[in-house]
């Protein structure tokens, strides 16, 4: 059924709709948008607020992550009232805030029933802590010291790795923490290969034992064979030698020292003797040296003491011993010196039969005189 006038216009319909038009103002969606955001411009224009600011900030410019715009740009009026932005470590991430038909996720859209990422926030805060850097540097220093000890052990073992470092990174937990280098584990020394330190210690002990052996051979009195006793006895012996040196220096300064060898030599000096001419030859025998002496003395116990001093001639000792043996004289003790001249001191025994045949000591003396090459002459 159509409500039309005679002229064909829909006047009835217009009359029915007129009260509605007078009571409700005519508004379009564009008018509503401009009323909410009066400064909203075209996307092609550089002024105003962009669509991304509305989606991220929820209509409130204070809640945006970016820096606030300059004060010359007036902020739009938000469509709805929003709560202040919580701190970063209390941000709630909701899967419900993701719009499957949109391209932008607003994490501040809802506040309830969220899974908080506190672990990630704590990691970021710890990464910015200065104590974390100190701990990382301490780890690096410990790694370097461990590598030096490993090098020393490898050098002592005579083999092993070349000392290179394995690039193993130890992360500090995020946030740009410094990475340290950890050395490779030290390989144990090869079996059968002696350590350099062990060989050096063996050589040192061998030298010490050799020196102790030399010291033990020099010191005359060693109580025990251990090292402590050897050193103690050596110190005592050195002190004794020092005391002897001091005493000898004192005696040499005072002139009290006497030599027994000088006295023995003075006893051998005699006056000049001239033997008679030899009957076998017309030539005279040369003068006897002032040190020539022939003495024979009988003792009460039956022994005979013989003292002889003359010039040294070839085969003097064998001829003298043969002459004494011919007389039956047996030498018990004899001291002979051939330093410059020939000298002999002897203590002899004689058989009873030979003693009866020998009248006196003069016969023994003449025998010694002839054995010395002085002919048949007698001593004056």
From Swiss-Prot:
Detail the disulphide connectivity of this chain as listed in its UniProt entry: none
Q: Write down a Pfam family by its short name.
A: HLH
One annotated Gene Ontology cellular component of this protein: nucleus
Respond yes or no to whether keyword Methyltransferase is given for this record.
no
Against InterPro entries, the record matches this protein to: bHLH_dom (IPR011598), HLH_DNA-bd_sf (IPR036638), TF_AMS/ICE1/BHLH6-like (IPR051358)
Q: Where is this region: Basic motif?
A: 192-205
Superkingdom of origin: Eukaryota
Q: Which Gene3D superfamilies match?
A: Helix-loop-helix DNA-binding domain
- Keywords in alphabetical order, please: Cytoplasm, DNA-binding, Nucleus, Transcription, Transcription regulation
Q: List the residue ranges of the region (Disordered).
A: 180-202, 270-289
**GO terms for molecular function, please?**
DNA-binding transcription factor activity; protein dimerization activity; sequence-specific DNA binding
Region span, Helix-loop-helix motif: 206-241
Residues in bHLH domain copies: 192-241
The biological processes this protein is annotated with in GO are:
regulation of DNA-templated transcription
| Subcellular localization, as worded in the UniProt entry | Nucleus; Cytoplasm
Work out whether the entry's keyword set contains Nucleotidyltransferase. Answer: no
Role summary:
Probable transcription factor.
Sequence similarity: Belongs to the bHLH protein family.
The protein in question is named Basic helix-loop-helix protein 004
Instruction: Provide the species name.
Output: Oryza sativa subsp. japonica (Rice)
Task: Report which gene this protein is encoded by.
Answer: BHLH004
